[in-house]
UniProtKB/Swiss-Prot annotation:
The gene is EXTL1. It comes from the Eukaryota. Belongs to the glycosyltransferase 47 family. Disulfide bonds join 584-634. Pfam families: Exostosin_GT47, Glyco_transf_64. This is Exostosin-like 1. It comes from Homo sapiens. Residues 31-676 are lumenal.
Amino acid sequence: MQSWRRRKSLWLALSASWLLLVLLGGFSLLRLALPPRPRPGASQGWPRWLDAELLQSFSQPGELPEDAVSPPQAPHGGSCNWESCFDTSKCRGDGLKVFVYPAVGTISETHRRILASIEGSRFYTFSPAGACLLLLLSLDAQTGECSSMPLQWNRGRNHLVLRLHPAPCPRTFQLGQAMVAEASPTVDSFRPGFDVALPFLPEAHPLRGGAPGQLRQHSPQPGVALLALEEERGGWRTADTGSSACPWDGRCEQDPGPGQTQRQETLPNATFCLISGHRPEAASRFLQALQAGCIPVLLSPRWELPFSEVIDWTKAAIVADERLPLQVLAALQEMSPARVLALRQQTQFLWDAYFSSVEKVIHTTLEVIQDRIFGTSAHPSLLWNSPPGALLALSTFSTSPQDFPFYYLQQGSRPEGRFSALIWVGPPGQPPLKLIQAVAGSQHCAQILVLWSNERPLPSRWPETAVPLTVIDGHRKVSDRFYPYSTIRTDAILSLDARSSLSTSEVDFAFLVWQSFPERMVGFLTSSHFWDEAHGGWGYTAERTNEFSMVLTTAAFYHRYYHTLFTHSLPKALRTLADEAPTCVDVLMNFIVAAVTKLPPIKVPYGKQRQEAAPLAPGGPGPRPKPPAPAPDCINQIAAAFGHMPLLSSRLRLDPVLFKDPVSVQRKKYRSLEKP
């Protein structure tokens, strides 16, 4: 009995001691483990751990980080937000229009590229009075000259001060109500929802196009290092994962990178890239990691990630606590291959969509501001964080992913089963009676629109059809073929020329193929591009070969959204080129679709009697002349404007089942395609 009482007393004493320990130390442990929960609707930055004073007590005075003594102060106007410091009433007419203050004195090549990218965009205006946003370049990287206060400053209201480098220009005037678009701003000075975080751009960053992502195999190859650590002097060093302390103490094997000779330009050759969060200069390594397909691992970052307002960086980067090196390394080693694959794919998409050129960075900045202006009509997160990205998914067309051709598969939907035929009638201006009857006979045709582009008067009579026929007169430019007419009521467009010659069966089969590939162009006659070594440029041929990269728009199916891109996204110079050289319009339209989809067009067969001819050729069966080739410099001018060559070659042609098979004709659905 006494033994039992002693055990009970001992158990009570242990319980009381444990309870006292919990009461005394529990609150401190909670403060150590959990950051405060953000209030609903409040902006959320990087985690701010509450135990900094506890951790510093374990360090020697010389080991404390230098930049931890005096955090950067918020800029003047820190109380500004979008509602109080920006007047959206100036943007109600034409949306976002940007005026750039002219530079004074000598400017750097980077600033010259910025000016060129804005002046060639749909946002630019020559008049400050008609501008919704006034842009001021703050600091010249080469000359170090600072901008002075402009005449229309108005306390900075509706102004955007652009800083390309983390080190700010010494201020000769107060920012007031101006927004700041700065490279790698610190989390203490950044105003969420008002300022815009930019990437740290190198001086030699290309104006347009840019180099593609360097990831060639999404699954890590055997022997490739798991970790790469950025260095203060530039370059990367790979980590031997056998030593868990290697990434933090510098004992790593040097890796020059694939095919690189200059250390400062070396791209990391690893699966994960460890990037310090203390030094703003480390942000310059962030873009290198994205381009290389190396998953960025940010160690307690103190700078805002670029475009964090719209880009979901949890899908492409990892934020880790630098105080837990062993746990971070173990977590990276145990990460599933599926997760690694998803992160690496997202790095390549983000690099190509928003960061590969100066033009994309500037246009992304303006799109972020335009989304704030539109409010409820802004891009949803899916459009920003899924290919092809918000720059190619114009919110002026729609903000619903279901309306864009490249999101059908992701949304589990498919386009409607009807199309609109758009027939371009140029000189000599004869009504395409047979073509209208053939197209109207399709069970999928919803309407026919005839674009009359001729000096001759309109015919008084048109053929009677089972579908509505609308004639639009007065459009003389070739680019008017690709205008987003409000009368087009279907997703699919069948673009035709008055000289086209197609049968109803050909139209039906081509449309069914397009329904399976709504983001691509489906056509009958193809052409291809090639690199001409002799002339040092791109060439174009309409000869029948085993490969093709373009289809003629004189007989092709595509989604109506590409009319919106053609009219509202292309630079005016390219549309003028299409009007002055009509044969260039096919190349230009194929460039647009290829740049969006990263895929080649699809070829479908046409009747046997037309195998040696183009469907745009006039007349009846028999040999017909080949379509005229574009001007020699056409494809090169378009490629220069895009900054790269988006066209891709294909060897695929889709035929109906049983096409030309030795079976009964009665068993074939599209038997007319094989008739002589």
